Design a protein with these regions (language model features):
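Active-site neighborhood of glycoside hydrolase catalytic domains
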Residues: 367-369, 401-403, 407-569, 579, ...
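Short Pro-Gly-centered flexible turn/kink motifs
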Residues: 85-88, 257-276, 709-717
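Aromatic-lined carbohydrate-binding/catalytic grooves of carbohydrate-active enzymes
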Residues: 297-439, 448, 453
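Carbohydrate-binding surface patches
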Residues: 203-207, 215, 622-666
Length: 719
C-alpha cells in the first residue's frame, strides 16, 4: 500500500525557477501536491544559495479556505452542496514563450474531492525584471457554485523591518504618497467606487524590506493590479507566521460570483517586481514594462496639446475654437482638443445638467460643424481632438427620454443623481448599452474620420448599485460585469481604430490603472493644474506610471483651482516633467509670455524623447517637505539627461546642499547646458561646463535659486 502511494506522489518536489535578468521567483510542486512559494528576490547564482542562507519560505503559493488554512487565503468557494472546503493539488505544469517574448509557466490544479480546477499563470519579462500572475478557475459540478474570494495573487514576504508605500487621495489631490511601517494586523488598500477606482487609493504598492524606503538603494518589492474595477490589496502580519502575507485581486465584497458549470472565470493580472535599487528601481522597472508591453503606443511620441476646458469651459463656439487653434499653432502646438460643451441638438450642452448621451454636434454652437474645425486645424498644421463621456447620461437628454431602462438604478427607488443633480451611469452589463457606447466613438469617427484624439471622461461613481439587465440572483455580479462590458467596448474600439489616441480621464486622475492602458494612450493626471500641487501629484504617479502617460498642462495664473499666482516658467518647467500640454486661452498671455511659451514648446520638443522614454531618477521628493524638489531623466544609453530643480519656498537660513545627480555613466563626460532659461542672455554659471558623470553623481554641484517658485532645467549631453 505504501509503495503504491509513493508511486503516485513523488517524494521530492520539482523546482520551477522563474527568473528575469536580476530576480528569481522559485516555486516547487509535484503531481498530487500543492504549489509552494519558496523564494522571491535577487537572482542567486544557484538555487542552493537560497536554502544555505535561510532565505526560503516554502508557503502555499495559492492558499484556499477550508482545509488547514487559518492564514490569509487567496481563494474561497461555496460548492453546490454547501461545502466550503478546497484543497488544490497539481495535475500538470507547462512552460512556453508568448509571441511578445514573455516566458509563461502554467500550473494546473484540481481539488482533491470536487471537480473544481484552477490554472495559475506566471509570466516573466526578462529585461524589465517584471513577473505577472493571474488565475483561471472552472468546475464541472452539477450545479452552480459561488466564488466568495478570488485573488489574483498571493505573495508571502519574510518578516523584517518592513515599510509600505502607497498612493491615496481624492479629486484635485490624486496620487498622494503615503509611507508607514507595517505592524501586526491587517492593512487594506481598496476601492468600492465602482467607476473611478483611483481616487481613494491606487491598486499599487511598494514594500521596503530593510527599513524606511530609500529612493535609490535598498531592497524593495513592488506590485500593481491591472484591474479597472473595485480592488483589494491586503497586507497581513500576525504572530502565527514569520512573514507578511500580501493578497491582491478583485474586491469580493458585494461581488460574490455565481459560477456555472464549465464556465471559466479569469482574475485580473497582478504585476510585481523586485529591486535592490530602492523605490527608484521599482519605478524604472514598471515604467519600462509599461511602455514596452502594456500601454498602447507606449513607445510612441506624445503630441503637445491645448485643451479648451479651462480656457472657455462650456462656452464653446466656432470662432472661439478657431482662434484658440490659430494661437496655439503660432507658438508651436501640435494638437487641439475641444473639451466639454460642443454637443446636444434638442438640449444644447450649456452647462453640466443636460445632454450627456446626445453625441451630435450642437448647430447652435458650431453652425459649421466639426469638419470645419478640423479643416481649420489642418490649415494651421495641427491635429484635432474631442471630449466625450460615453458611459453617462443626463435625465435631461434625448437618450434618457428614449431609454430610461439603460441606466443603473434600483427598480423601486428614485436613483441618486450625480453632477448637476441630473447625471446617471449607463448599464454596461447590457449588450445594447455596450453597442451604444461603442457607437459614440464609431459614429464620430465615421462622420469625422480625421479626428486624431479623444478624451474619454467619467464624472460619476457607481452610486446606484443595481442593474435592470442582470437577473435578480446575479446582482452581486454588477461591479464585475460592468467592467467586463466596458473592456468589451474598449476592445471593439481598438480593433477598429488602433491608431486613435484616447486619453483616460475620470474627474481627473480617477482611473489611473494599468488595466486601462492596453486601450488608452495616456491619463489626465488631475483637474488640479496648479504647478505646486502637480509636483506632489506627478511625483506620486511616477512611483508606478511613466511620464509619457502623465498629461501635465500649463494653465492660467492665478490658478483656477487654488488661486495661486505662479510664474510662467515654473508652470512650464513642471509640465515638462510629463507629457506637456496647455489648458488656457493662449490669447490671455502677454506678447512676452507668448514668446516664452513658443521657446518652451520648442525646447520640450528637443528633449521629448528623454522625458517620455527615459529612466526617471527622483532626487528630492516634494514629500520630504524641503524647499527644493528635484528629478531627472536619462536615456537608457546614458548619452543624454535632463535635470529639473524647483524651489517652492525661500528660507533665508537654509544652506544650499550639493545637487548630486543619478543615472549617468561614471566613465563619460557631460556637457551641461541650461535650457528653457527665463533670460537666454543670463544663464546659470554651469552652462557650457564639461564634468564627468562620476563627479556629478558623487560630488554634484552647487546651485542656488533665490526666490519662491523659481526653477531651472539643465540638459546633459555625453561627450
Amino acid at each position: 500500500m505504501i509503495a503504491v502511494l509513493f508511486n503516485m506522489v513523488p517524494l521530492f518536489a520539482e523546482e520551477y525557477e522563474i527568473s528575469t535578468a536580476n530576480t528569481t521567483l522559485l516555486l516547487e510542486t509535484s503531481i498530487g501536491r500543492r504549489v509552494n512559494f519558496v523564494y522571491y528576490g535577487p537572482r542567486p547564482a544557484t538555487p542552493d544559495e537560497i536554502y544555505s542562507t535561510g532565505s526560503d519560505i516554502r508557503w502555499n503559493a495559492y492558499p484556499c479556505f477550508g482545509t488547514n488554512c487559518t492564514c490569509e487565503h487567496a481563494l474561497a468557494v461555496t460548492h453546490a452542496n454547501g461545502d466550503v472546503s478546497l484543497e488544490l493539488a497539481t495535475q500538470d505544469v507547462k512552460q512556453y514563450t508568448d509571441p511578445d517574448g514573455g516566458r509563461v509557466w502554467e500550473f494546473l490544479m484540481k481539488d482533491k474531492v470536487f471537480p473544481f480546477y484552477v490554472k495559475q499563470f506566471y509570466k516573466a519579462y526578462d529585461e524589465c525584471d517584471i513577473i505577472k500572475t493571474w488565475t483561471e478557475m472552472w468546475h464541472t459540478e452539477k450545479k452552480t457554485i459561488t466564488l466568495d474570494k478570488f485573488a489574483s495573487a498571493y505573495i508571502p514576504v519574510k518578516s523584517g523591518d518592513l515599510y509600505l508605500s502607497y498612493l491615496a487621495g481624492g479629486w484635485g489631490a490624486e496620487a498622494q504618497l503615503f509611507e508607514e511601517r507595517i505592524t501586526r494586523g491587517r492593512k487594506t488598500i481598496g476601492n468600492h467606487d465602482g467607476a473611478r477606482t483611483s481616487f481613494n487609493g491606487n491598486p499599487s504598492f511598494m514594500v521596503s524590506l530593510d527599513g524606511p524606503a530609500q529612493e535609490n538603494s535598498g531592497n524593495v518589492l513592488g506590485g500593481t493590479l491591472a484591474y479597472t474595477g473595485n480592488y483589494d490589496l491586503s497586507f497581513v502580519k500576525n504572530g502565527n507566521a514569520n512573514h507578511l502575507e500580501i493578497t491582491a485581486g478583485i474586491n469580493a465584497e458585494l461581488s460574490q460570483y455565481k459560477l456555472d458549470p464549465k464556465v471559466t472565470f479569469t482574475t485580473p493580472e497582478f504585476i510585481f517586481t523586485y529591486s535592490t535599487e530602492g523605490k527608484g528601481g521599482i519605478s524604472r522597472n514598471l515604467h519600462r514594462w509599461g511602455r514596452n508591453y502594456q500601454i498602447i503606443g507606449g513607445t510612441d511620441s506624445r503630441e503637445i496639446l491645448l485643451n479648451s476646458w479651462e480656457g472657455v469651459y462650456f462656452k464653446v463656439n466656432q470662432e472661439g475654437m478657431n482662434a484658440m487653434m490659430r494661437d496655439f499653432a503660432a507658438i508651436g502646438g501640435e494638437l487641439f482638443v475641444m473639451d466639454d460643451g460642443w454637443f446636444g441638438d434638442k438640449y444644447p450642452r450649456d452647462n453640466e445638467t443636460t445632454s450627456l448621451g446626445d453625441w451630435v454636434v450642437s448647430t447652435k454652437k458650431l453652425p459649421e460643424g466639426i469638419n470645419a474645425l478640423i479643416d481649420e486645424a489642418e490649415r494651421n498644421g495641427i491635429k484635432f481632438g474631442i471630449w466625450i463621456e460615453p458611459e453617462m447620461t443626463n435625465t435631461k437628454s434625448e437618450l434618457y427620454e428614449k431609454h430610461p431602462d439603460w441606466v443603473l438604478r434600483q427598480p423601486d427607488r428614485e436613483p441618486f443623481k450625480g453632477r448637476g443633480d441630473t447625471q446617471l451611469m449607463l448599464d454596461l452589463c447590457n449588450p445594447e448599452v455596450q453597442d451604444h457606447v461603442f457607437g459614440v466613438v464609431d459614429n464620430l469617427m465615421q462622420a469625422h474620420p480625421r479626428i486624431y484624439y479623444m478624451k474619454w471622461d467619467a464624472n460619476m461613481s457607481m452610486n446606484n448599485a443595481s442593474s435592470l439587465y442582470l437577473p435578480k440572483d446575479r446582482q452581486s455580479h454588477l461591479y464585475i460585469e460592468y467592467h467586463r462590458g466596458l473592456m468589451n467596448v474598449c476592445k471593439r474600439i481598438r480593433e477598429k481604430y488602433p491608431d486613435l489616441i484616447i486619453q483616460l480621464c475620470a474627474s481627473g486622475g480617477g482611473r489611473l490603472n494599468y488595466g486601462f492602458f492596453p486601450y488608452f494612450n495616456e491619463c489626465w493626471s488631475s483637474d488640479n493644474t496648479d504647478a505646486i500641487q502637480r509636483l506632489y501629484i506627478q511625483c506620486g504617479m511616477s512611483h508606478f506610471y511613466p511620464a509619457n502617460i502623465m498629461a501635465s498642462h500649463v494653465s492660467a495664473s492665478p490658478n483656477h483651482q487654488t488661486k495661486r499666482v505662479v510664474p510662467l516658467k515654473f508652470r512650464f518647467d513642471v509640465a515638462m516633467t510629463g507629457r506637456l500640454g496647455m489648458e488656457m486661452k493662449p490669447s490671455d498671455l502677454t506678447e512676452k509670455e507668448m514668446e516664452f511659451a513658443k521657446n518652451a514648446i520648442g525646447t520640450y520638443k528637443s528633449i521629448r524623447p528623454v522625458i517620455q522614454q527615459g529612466d526617471l531618477y527622483r532626487l528630492i521628493s516634494p514629500y520630504e517637505e524641503k524647499p527644493y524638489v528635484s528629478l531627472m531623466y536619462c536615456t537608457p544609453e546614458k548619452d543624454r539627461a535632463v535635470y529639473f530643480l524647483f524651489r517652492r519656498s525661500y528660507l533665508r537660513d537654509t544652506w544650499e546642499d550639493a545637487r548630486k545627480l543619478a543615472g549617468l555613466d561614471p566613465d563619460r563626460n557631460y556637457m551641461i547646458r541650461e535650457i528653457n532659461a527665463a533670460d537666454p542672455q543670463k544663464k546659470v554659471y554651469l552652462d557650457g561646463k564639461v564634468v564627468s558623470g562620476r563627479f556629478l553623481m558623487e560630488n554634484g554641484f552647487r546651485l542656488n535659486l533665490g526666490q519662491d517658485m523659481s526653477s531651472i532645467v539643465l540638459e546633459l549631453i555625453a561627450q
